[in-house]
């Protein structure tokens, strides 16, 4: 693995290896040990979108591993004044050992990977959120003991999270049902890939179908960053897609809930459902740091 731009193209073995490494980093940290596997390494954290969890977990994780993380917002870079992405990539590649980038367009990540000459990791784009779904998979496996054979349901917008849930969950042997309103389908190439899994994948407009007999239910915000002008229309379109107690009752009694946060209580998730599943949702928020450590260790330290 040279980069982590999306989950598509990763083998099940590569995904599970990252989860295994993340488990080990968590075990060691709980024992008071943080291996300095990034000693002498510098990572550029290029963020065109705001972030609480991804930014802070990366900064803390890189520090714990003995490395340096430099946060660069859009206003810190000359790309804001017209410098081509490929030129910024070439410069960062001379200074840093890796780049983690949260941006809007997937093509920006592709350009960074092509021209920087160093590993590039997606911190989220409009197309995919691979670190998040790897973290979800780690959290589900911790609690369920396995991934293969579980049913995953996603209720909400067929956007970046849904794209990565489809690819990641199918790759590790889960059955996936995605429920989204008409006009909010996942990416065409992701749906094409999902077809290869036959009846292990279902796309529906019925959120109850996604919830029925689920082992884990995923959801995400209805209005993602950059969509603020569409907010009212989206809220109307997503009426009936709230993960509420009635919908949870359709799932298995021990069904987990995963939400990437921040959560909009009363929109994509009911307040009582979020609180009932807060432990697993915030376990996932914690686990992000271990997955990020694992990805950087695989890319930079030969783990």
Listing of model-derived features with the role each one plays in the protein:
Residues 195-271:
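Rossmann-like adenosine-cofactor binding region
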Residues 1-56, 60:
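Positively charged, low-complexity intrinsically disordered leader regions
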Residues 109-125, 229-251, 276-278:
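A short, gly/pro- and small-residue-rich
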Residues 42-43, 47-95:
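Active-site cofactor/substrate anionic-group-binding motifs, chiefly glycine-
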Residues 254-255, 260-303:
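Adenosine-phosphate binding glycine-rich loop
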Residues 97-168, 259:
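Anion-binding alpha/beta catalytic cores of soluble intermediary-metabolism enzymes, centered on
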Residues 48-60, 142-219:
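Glycine-rich phosphate/diphosphate-binding loop of Rossmann-like nucleotide-binding domains
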């Amino acid at each position: 693995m040279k980069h982590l731009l999306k989950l598509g193209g990763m083998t099940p073995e590569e995904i599970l290896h990252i989860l295994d490494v993340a488990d080990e980093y968590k075990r060691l940290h709980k024992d008071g040990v943080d291996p300095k596997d990034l000693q002498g390494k510098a990572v550029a954290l290029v963020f065109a979108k705001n972030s609480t969890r991804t930014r802070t977990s990366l900064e803390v994780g890189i520090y714990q591993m003995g490395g340096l993380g430099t946060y660069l917002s859009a206003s810190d870079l000359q790309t804001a004044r017209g410098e081509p992405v490929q030129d910024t990539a070439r410069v960062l590649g001379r200074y840093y050992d890796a780049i983690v980038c949260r941006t809007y367009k997937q093509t920006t990540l592709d350009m960074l990977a092509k021209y920087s000459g160093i590993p590039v990791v997606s911190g989220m784009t409009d197309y995919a959120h691979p670190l998040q779904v790897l973290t979800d998979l780690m959290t589900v496996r911790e609690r369920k003991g396995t991934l293969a054979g579980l049913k995953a349901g996603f209720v909400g917008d067929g956007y970046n999270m849904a794209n990565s849930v489809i690819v990641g969950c199918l790759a590790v042997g889960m059955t996936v049902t995605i429920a989204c309103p008409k006009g909010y389908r996942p990416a065409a190439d992701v749906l094409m890939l999902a077809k290869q899994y036959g009846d292990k994948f279902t796309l529906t407009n019925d959120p109850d179908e996604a919830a029925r007999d689920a082992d884990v239910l995923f959801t995400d915000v209805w209005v993602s960053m950059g969509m603020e002008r569409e907010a009212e229309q989206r809220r109307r379109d997503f009426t009936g897609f709230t993960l509420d107690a009635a919908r949870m009752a359709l799932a298995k009694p021990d069904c987990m809930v995963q939400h990437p946060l921040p959560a909009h209580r009363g929109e994509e998730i009911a307040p009582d459902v979020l609180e009932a599943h807060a432990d697993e949702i915030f376990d996932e928020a914690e686990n992000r740091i271990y997955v990020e450590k694992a990805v950087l260790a695989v890319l930079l330290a030969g783990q």
